[in-house]
């Protein structure tokens, strides 16, 4: 569980760096866009799409720990209020246990969403940068492919890391699911009746 929380913190920091890097390139290429009025509208449209993808990306936060709601001290509180408070605490603890059991599955979904969003926003960002840089050079120079840029290589490395983490989380979820099924199967098995076992012992020749 600690490893998953550390991973989410690392992903959040990496995504904040990518966002700051996007805004840095935006401020850096503004003079180039102003020097070419023909390509200004096209570049601004792509930039708006990229910023919309970045803004719509939301990380799924881990479920917070359940906190017992204690209104009054035990000395001044009524017995009914204390009983109600203990029941609410037990319900919250049960919900916390269920959320912890569903944590690997939620983490797999959030990592998958993050992978898709990173690919979409990164590809649009690389295409936007290549189109803006092509507007600043002459038409005789051939435009470099977006896949050969350092940004695309960085995006590919981030995607590989997310893919490895997603694979590990899926393996953890499957292991937890097998353990849960085995636990349910053991508790659901019929227990032998002690009266029948005594009769069988009495009928046995030994």
From Swiss-Prot:
GO biological process: spermatid development
The keyword Mitochondrion is assigned to this record: no
Keywords, comma-separated and alphabetical: Cytoplasmic vesicle, Differentiation, Spermatogenesis
Region (Disordered): 180-206
TM region positions: none
Tissue: Expressed in sperm (at protein level).
Domain of life: Eukaryota
One Gene Ontology cellular component annotation held by this UniProt entry: nucleus
Localization of this protein: Cytoplasmic vesicle, Secretory vesicle, Acrosome
PANTHER family hit by this protein: CHROMOSOME 7 OPEN READING FRAME 61, SPERM ACROSOME DEVELOPMENTAL REGULATOR
UniProt function note: May play a role in acrosome formation and nucleus shaping during spermiogenesis.
Disease involvement: A variant causing a frameshift predicted to result in a premature termination codon has been found in a patient with globozoospermia.
Annotated protein name in UniProt: Sperm acrosome developmental regulator
Species this chain originates from: Homo sapiens
Name of the gene: SPACDR
């Amino acid at each position: 569980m600690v490893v998953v929380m550390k991973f989410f913190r690392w992903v959040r920091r990496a995504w904040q760096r990518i966002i700051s890097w996007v805004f840095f390139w935006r401020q850096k290429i503004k003079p180039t866009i102003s020097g070419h009025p023909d390509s200004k509208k096209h570049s601004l449209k792509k930039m708006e799409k990229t910023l919309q993808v970045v803004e719509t990306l939301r990380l799924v936060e881990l479920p917070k720990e359940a906190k017992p709601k204690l209104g009054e001290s035990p000395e001044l509180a009524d017995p009914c209020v204390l009983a109600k408070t203990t029941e609410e605490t037990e319900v919250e603890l049960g919900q916390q246990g269920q959320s912890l059991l569903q944590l690997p599955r939620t983490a797999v979904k959030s990592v998958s969403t993050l992978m898709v969003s990173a690919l979409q926003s990164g590809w649009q960002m690389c295409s936007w940068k290549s189109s803006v840089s092509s507007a600043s050079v002459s038409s005789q120079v051939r435009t470099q492919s977006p896949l050969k840029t350092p940004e695309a290589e960085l995006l590919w490395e981030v995607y590989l890391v997310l893919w490895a983490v997603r694979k590990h989380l899926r393996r953890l979820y499957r292991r937890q699911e097998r353990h849960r099924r085995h636990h349910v199967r053991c508790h659901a098995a019929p227990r032998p009746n002690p009266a029948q076992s005594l009769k069988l012992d009495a009928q046995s020749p030994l």
